[in-house]
Amino acid sequence: MAEAFSNSLTRAVGVVTTYSGSTVAAASTAITVTAATGIGVSDLVDNANYIAGTRVKQIVGTTVYTHRASTNTASAASQIVNFLGVTTAYTSPSAVKSILIGGTFANNTTSQVNLTVEVFDQSGDKTVGIAHKIPVPTGSSFVISDAGKTLLEGLDEVRVYTDTAGAIDVNLSILTGVS
């Protein structure tokens, strides 16, 4: 396959499910919510009792289990917990290597939003953050460039999360067909 430059455009990124009145168990992976509607496995957990990048591992009834323990030392009741749904902004074609050259993440709302960008390595079934909880002011953007390029193997993904529904427009610059 010959090398080719392209842009991957995604409008209005951001899927958020919020539950108030939640309980975060002490130093535990358990969050008790009033209902689990709208929460999905692999959603990011946005709450002061969890470090950035914590994700939903399992849902049983109204208990959500995360892949890492909370940081609180006592049970925390009456918590507002946001569950951030993923938007896949780019998937490298099967059996094709691509390079993420750069990207622009523009805030299209009237308030500041927080942005998380991750790369999912399909062959290793691992996810790593490029940017976690980056504040993007209204009328502004966050740009990935100059800091190095990211190699994507076949079926690897660039995933985007925001703490506000439909808040970010994504423009990724990609070079495909590299060897």
Residue map of PLM features:
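Beta-strand signatures of extracellular beta-sandwich domains
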Residues: T116-F120, N171-S173
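C-terminal interaction-tip segments
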Residues: M1-V15, L84-S98, G102-N108, Y161-S179
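Intrinsically disordered, low-complexity Pro/Gly/Ser/Thr-rich segments with frequent PxxP/GP/PP motifs
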Residues: S123-E157
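Short, charged beta-turn/beta-strand-edge "cap" motif at the junction between a beta-strand
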Residues: N49-T54, G148-L151, T164-G166
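Short proline/glycine-enriched turn/loop motifs at strand-loop junctions of beta-rich domains
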Residues: A36-G40, T109-Q112, G166
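Small/polar beta-strand repeat architecture
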Residues: V16-G85
